[in-house]
Structures are given as structure tokens and as C-alpha cells.
């Protein structure tokens, strides 16, 4: 994935130097967590039920696009349980020994959070099966015919796994999670609440209409909303009086090249290439990526999900196709035969 993607203000991934700010804005409890009401209610029941029984909760799998709060929920789960949180990621667990060391250091009721759990190496995943199910691991000592397996007990713990690609998890791993929850994109009104909370923490004077303006350009993602808020704050402090009004927000987002729908330069380049260079498609993602000078994974994993959700691009067996909404967005007349959307637009029912 290209570095340009990581520098985009509308990227749902954490950018360089953003981690500390991101942590400061994280909610500390389910009560503080805004959005995802169904998931919050379900987690509240799981947590309170386990606390009432004095037991360790079932293992929890959180899935959904990046930037929606999966890591925040893992931290909240540990805090609500009064437990310690140990954090790692799938790519960091390359060998079974890496996982064995982490598991051996757990104490009873600890919460182990594995981000990007779909990327865990197979040897570590197979060790995780036994740890999740029986709270033990088998450590192989020696090599060849003389190797022996030594069982080691693991303190009862709760695994919280996070994934942006639930379909990439193996069946045996997925089946070992007692509770699974999918997190959806946020509604603009929910993002307004996220922005108001962040503004209070950061000491930013944010008008209600300005918050609504930023929210509707945030692609349904709290992390993007908080990032755009900081960009607008910079603009307001340098070119205005520090107060963020709707007009200030609109002027700032124009400077940062984020339009009314939350699309940026790369999104518009993809739509422009799809319509102008390929007549609206269908066209393969690799060919489309070459046309905009990006890697295919960037187009497929970064731009496309939002463009599909916004109703501007449709996936077909023959390739990507621009919908009538994409042509309208570009102020172009769609070819004869191009109809409406193959899926609802963003925030539409």
C-alpha cells in the first residue's frame, strides 16, 4: 500500500505521529462511547453477566472497517471488567513461541487484545485454539523424533480479536469466539457527538453547524472526523479567530481538498478515470489503479469501499462500473443504459 494513502486526511488508518492524540480522545467507558448502540448494549450484558458470576467473559470478536473504535472497545472491556489489558497484533505473532510467551504472562481475568487477528501466522493460530478452549498450550521441546510436547496451563483470560476482514478468519478460529459483533459506519448525527466530545477535550470552540459540516464529510468514521477537526482547528487558529464556524470549516476543508461528500483527490481521480478513460466501465481494479498511478490494493481497500457505499461505484463480475450518481457527481451525462444504483448511497436506507 502506498505511503500517499497513509497521508490522506480521509484515511481511516492511524497516521504517523497520530497515536498519542488518538489515545487521548478515546472514551474510557461504554457510557462515554458514542455510536454503535446495539454493540454497546450487547457488550454491557456480556460484561455485567460475567461480573455477576465472577467468571471470565466469553472470547469476543469485533469486526468492521478501520477507524470505528474496535481498539477503544477492547480498552473499555478491560476497564469495565477491572482487568489488565495486554495488546498485540496478528502480524506480530509470527511464531507459536511469540504467542506462548504472551500467554504465559497472563494472570486470571486478563484481557488479551489481538488487532488484525486475521493476519496471525498459522502456527500461532493453532496454539491459540487450545488456549482459547482449554486454557492451556502445548510447548514442543526438542526437534525431530526426540521432540516432546509439554502442556502448560494458561490463566483463564478473555481474548478480544479485532478484524477488518472477518471473512479472512479460518472457521476453527472464528468458532472459538463466544460473542461476535460487527461495527457499522456512523451516522452524521453520531459523528457530531464524537466531534463535540473531542472539541471539549482539545479545548476547541466548535459551533453546532460547523460540527455538522465536518461530520458529513467524515465518511462515517470517527477517526477521520477527529482528524478533520484538528485540520480545521489549525486553519481557524491561523486564518480566523480560532473559533470554528460553519464557514470556517468549509473554507478549511476546501484547503485540505475534502469535498462535501468526504471525497478527496484520489477518490475523484478514480471516478474520473472510470468515467472519462473507460466510459464508465466495467474495468478491472488493476487497470483502474494504473490509470490513477496507485497500487491496486490502495484502490481496492481504501477508495473502493467508500465509493461503493456512497453509491458511486458498483462491483460486477466483469469489473467496476460507475453508477449514474458518479456521473452526476462529476457533472457529466451518463451513457444511455446507465441506471441508478446497485446499492443504496451512503446513509440511505
UniProtKB/Swiss-Prot annotation:
One of its GO terms (cellular component) is cytoplasm. ATP binds at residues 25-26, 67, 70-72, 133-135, 176, 186, 223. Coiled coil: none annotated. Pfam families: AAA_lid_4 (PF17864), RuvB_C (PF05491), RuvB_N (PF05496). Keywords: ATP-binding, Cytoplasm, DNA damage, DNA recombination, DNA repair, DNA-binding, Hydrolase, Nucleotide-binding. GO terms for biological process: DNA recombination; DNA repair. Its EC number is 3.6.4.-. Mg(2+) binds at residue 71. Has 3 domains, the large (RuvB-L) and small ATPase (RuvB-S) domains and the C-terminal head (RuvB-H) domain. The head domain binds DNA, while the ATPase domains jointly bind ATP, ADP or are empty depending on the state of the subunit in the translocation cycle. During a single DNA translocation step the structure of each domain remains the same, but their relative positions change. The RuvA-RuvB-RuvC complex processes Holliday junction (HJ) DNA during genetic recombination and DNA repair, while the RuvA-RuvB complex plays an important role in the rescue of blocked DNA replication forks via replication fork reversal (RFR). RuvA specifically binds to HJ cruciform DNA, conferring on it an open structure. The RuvB hexamer acts as an ATP-dependent pump, pulling dsDNA into and through the RuvAB complex. RuvB forms 2 homohexamers on either side of HJ DNA bound by 1 or 2 RuvA tetramers; 4 subunits per hexamer contact DNA at a time. This is Holliday junction branch migration complex subunit RuvB. It comes from Mycobacterium leprae (strain TN). The gene is ruvB.
Amino acid at each position: 500500500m502506498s505511503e500517499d494513502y497513509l497521508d490522506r486526511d480521509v484515511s481511516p488508518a492511524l497516521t504517523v505521529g497520530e497515536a498519542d492524540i488518538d489515545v487521548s480522545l478515546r472514551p474510557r467507558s461504554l457510557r462515554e462511547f458514542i455510536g454503535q448502540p446495539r454493540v454497546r448494549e450487547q457488550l454491557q450484558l456480556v460484561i455485567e453477566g460475567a461480573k455477576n458470576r465472577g467468571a471470565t467473559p466469553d472470547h469476543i470478536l469485533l469486526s468492521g472497517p478501520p477507524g470505528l473504535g474496535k481498539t477503544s472497545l477492547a480498552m473499555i472491556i478491560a476497564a469495565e471488567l477491572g482487568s489488565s489489558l495486554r495488546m498485540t497484533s496478528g502480524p506480530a505473532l509470527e511464531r507459536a513461541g511469540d504467542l506462548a510467551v504472551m500467554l504465559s504472562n497472563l494472570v486470571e481475568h486478563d484481557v488479551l487484545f489481538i488487532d488484525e487477528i486475521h493476519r496471525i501466522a498459522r502456527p500461532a493460530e493453532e496454539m491459540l485454539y487450545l488456549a482459547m478452549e482449554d486454557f492451556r498450550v502445548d510447548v514442543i521441546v526438542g526437534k525431530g523424533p526426540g521432540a516432546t510436547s509439554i502442556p502448560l496451563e494458561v490463566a483463564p483470560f478473555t481474548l478480544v480479536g479485532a478484524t477488518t476482514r472477518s471473512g479472512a478468519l479460518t472457521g476453527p478460529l472464528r468458532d472459538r469466539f463466544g460473542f461476535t459483533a460487527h461495527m457499522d459506519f456512523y451516522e452524521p448525527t453520531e459523528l457530531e457527538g464524537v466531534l463535540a466530545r473531542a472539541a471539549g477535550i482539545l479545548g476547541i470552540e466548535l459551533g453546532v453547524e460547523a460540527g455538522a459540516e465536518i461530520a458529513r464529510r467524515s465518511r462515517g468514521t470517527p477517526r477521520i472526523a477527529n482528524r478533520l477537526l484538528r485540520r480545521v482547528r489549525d486553519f481557524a487558529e491561523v486564518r480566523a479567530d480560532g473559533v470554528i464556524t460553519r464557514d470556517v470549516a468549509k473554507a478549511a476543508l476546501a484547503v485540505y481538498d475534502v469535498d462535501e461528500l468526504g471525497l478527496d483527490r484520489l477518490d475523484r481521480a478514480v471516478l474520473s478515470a472510470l468515467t472519462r478513460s473507460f466510459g464508465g466501465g466495467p474495468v478491472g481494479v488493476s487497470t483502474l489503479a494504473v490509470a490513477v498511478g496507485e497500487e491496486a490494493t490502495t484502490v481496492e481497500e481504501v477508495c473502493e469501499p467508500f465509493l461503493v457505499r456512497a453509491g458511486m461505484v458498483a462491483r460486477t463480475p466483469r469489473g467496476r462500473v460507475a453508477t449514474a450518481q458518479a456521473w452526476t457527481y462529476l457533472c457529466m451525462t451518463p451513457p444511455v443504459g446507465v441506471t441508478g444504483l446497485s446499492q443504496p448511497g451512503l446513509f440511505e436506507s
